[in-house]
Amino acid sequence: MHNFDFAKPSTIADAAKALAADGAQALSGGQTLIPTMKQRLAAPGVLVSLTGIAEMQGVCTGDGGLHIGAATPHAVVAKEARAHYPALADLAGGIGDPAVRSRGTIGGSIANNDPAACYPSAVLASGATVVTNKRKIA
């Protein structure tokens, strides 16, 4: 693995600023990124941790929908989404093993189009809107 700098912002604005740096890569669960780095297939100059950003964590309801932060682990999605979206909870509960479910995140799976997680298909099938710091993708 190559050397890298590490940033741990506490707000979305600070994360966006850190991610604007050349060679920066977002990190939350790291279930895809870290193995890729170990194989020397990726060499980001800066890892920007999203785990300390409260707005990117958890599952809540509001505005007629279910809101899931990108840094929310699969295990939390499996538990917290059950009452409102059982199919999504089942999907999240079937990803990997308990260790992967406790670290891997919904945002990482969607961003990497991870075929083992099936979240990209769930996003399309449910008509979900993905909200970033710059735009809404529906």
Predicted regions and their residues:
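C-terminal structural segment of proteins
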Residues: 1-138
